[in-house]
Amino acid sequence: MIYPGRGASLSVAVALVLFSSGAPWTFREEKEDVDREVCSESKIATTKYPCVKSTGEVTTCYRKKCCEGFKFVLGQCIPEDYDVCAGAPCEQQCTDHFGRVVCTCYDGYRYDRERHRNREKPYCLDIDECANNNETVCSQMCVNTPGSYRCDCHSGFYLEDDGKTCTKGERAPLFEKSDNVMKEGTCSATCEDFHQMKMTVLQLKQKMSLLSSNTEINKQMTNEKMMMTTNSFLPGPPGPPGPAGTPGAKGSSGSPGQMGPPGLPGPRGDMGPIGPSPDLSHIKQGRRGPVGPPGAPGRDGMKGERGFPGPSGPPGPPGSFDFLLLMMADIRNDIAELQSKVFSRPLHSSFEDFPSAPDSWRDTPENLDFGSGEDYKSQSPPKSSRKRKLPRNLKNPDWPV
């Protein structure tokens, strides 16, 4: 698919928009843009709209496009119903593809993209069918022609009707010349020429008989004449296209297309050679200045791992037994209240029911100097105090065990 240039190129470029200041800008399009279009004689509509530059200044910008009912083809604004192939812009075949010119080559020709890119003609080159025997299938000789080929036979052979097969011998003549001897200066015709003219007249009559208005001519056609007009004398399929004509004059170059998108970044190049070392002898170095104030403290770091346990400390002083006695007294009061609620009668209870703590259990100035452990065990009370019996009033049967 190719798109050659055609005629004088009309620059419908957007460069006029940026000629004012050359600074980068942005635009703000409004709804009234359609009403501001002005169509010129070249069918190019110019639209004005406000735009804002990068500096914040509001200015007027212009945008160009084809007027309504026109389309942009090969740098020109032409009517939408205009045939772009009317001026024969292509070398061989032209197709209107939605307003674009599509040039193709005939059968038997190939399109050379490089020649067309360099604007060299002809860019539709002939295909040598004889170079590949599988395409021609000629039994003996193949002769390449512009856009096609033909088969020939050696001496003593003749070409069959298929145009490819050669048969040994000579072809028998289909028609012989008339035996009538014509005088010099007169026209003579062979039987073959006469037969062809007769068949042509019969074919014309057959076509006319198909028309509804020519009923009388249809009646005059006999069965014998209808039998003679067989399919063998009907016109055959169209032949291959003829050779290409001489190329025309070179047209003017078209308008430059729009700038394409930027390509992908290329690979990073190799590092260049290291330059010479700088000369620092001319740089003066003074005395180092004072140390500045410390900066702001940084953020707290992550919590560290737990350290190893430290050594065991010395034993502490012995504990007091008074707290345990108070707790037992509270439990006794709770039990007494529970019994009074269950049995509905008061029970005898006194603080004397509990044995008093031995003097050796109380905190004395002598015991405060001792710590826990073996040192405290050495100060155990005498056996007489440890075997002290409980009073008999604790053997009350009403006391729950």
UniProtKB/Swiss-Prot annotation:
Q: What is the lineage of its organism?
A: Eukaryota, Metazoa, Chordata, Craniata, Vertebrata
Q: What is this protein called?
A: Collagen and calcium-binding EGF domain-containing protein 1
Write down the superkingdom of origin. Answer: Eukaryota
GO BP terms, alphabetized: blood vessel morphogenesis; lymph vessel development; lymphangiogenesis; sprouting angiogenesis; vascular endothelial growth factor signaling pathway; venous blood vessel morphogenesis; venous endothelial cell migration involved in lymph vessel development
Q: Which gene encodes it?
A: ccbe1
Q: In which organism is this protein found?
A: Danio rerio (Zebrafish)
User: What range does the record give for the signal peptide?
Assistant: 1-22
List, alphabetically, the InterPro entries matched: Collagen (IPR008160), EGF-like_Ca-bd_dom (IPR001881), EGF-like_dom (IPR000742), EGF-type_Asp/Asn_hydroxyl_site (IPR000152), EGF_Ca-bd_CS (IPR018097)
UniProt subcellular location: Secreted
Compositionally biased intervals (Pro residues): 235-244
